[in-house]
């Protein structure tokens, strides 16, 4: 409902972020089903495909290409400090705060758990999802605000180091639904 209300005043892009979904264990058949279901839900919620752009992330190669470029200017330490990364690794039994990088890897391997690089790079892919379309306003939940701040930092870093290429986006956090976007 929040997104549908933006269609009159903005050029809107809505992604089915199937590549983000594979940062955790998944079933390919279930992912395909969920992708189609997400498109149907977008339309059922009032997102008019004639007035907005709905895309499947993995079908637009620019997302991964830009994510790679952004990863080359993203320090690993910035990614390891992301709250969502810490929370997800804690669920696997890791404590990012108390482990050196090498100890973190060895302890995880001994315990039979692992943290994949996709989980660590999730916010870089999210930044690519946003910057690819030169978005100036991004609806995010409070839980994603830190990722948007990284996106802003990456846009500014790229623009400073190379050329003014990216729009530095602002967060749009609606009062209603701020945690479920």
Predicted feature residues:
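Active-site cores that bind ATP or allylic diphosphates and position pyrophosphate for catalysis
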Residues: 86-181
């Amino acid at each position: 409902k929040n997104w549908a209300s933006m269609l009159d005043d903005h050029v809107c892009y809505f992604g089915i972020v199937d590549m983000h979904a594979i940062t955790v264990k998944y079933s390919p058949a279930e992912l395909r089903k969920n992708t189609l279901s997400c498109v149907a839900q977008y339309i059922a919620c009032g997102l008019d495909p004639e007035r907005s752009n709905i895309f499947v992330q993995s079908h637009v190669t620019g997302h991964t290409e830009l994510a790679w470029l952004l990863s080359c200017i993203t320090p690993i330490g910035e990614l390891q400090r992301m709250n969502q990364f810490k929370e997800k690794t804690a669920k696997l039994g890791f404590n990012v705060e108390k482990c050196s990088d090498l100890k973190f890897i060895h302890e995880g391997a001994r315990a039979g758990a692992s943290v994949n690089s996709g989980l660590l790079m999730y916010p870089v892919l999210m930044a690519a999802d946003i910057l690819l379309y030169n978005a100036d306003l991004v609806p995010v939940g409070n839980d994603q605000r830190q990722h948007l701040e990284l996106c802003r930092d990456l846009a500014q870093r790229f623009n400073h180091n190379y050329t003014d290429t990216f729009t530095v986006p602002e967060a749009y956090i609606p009062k209603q639904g701020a945690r479920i976007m």
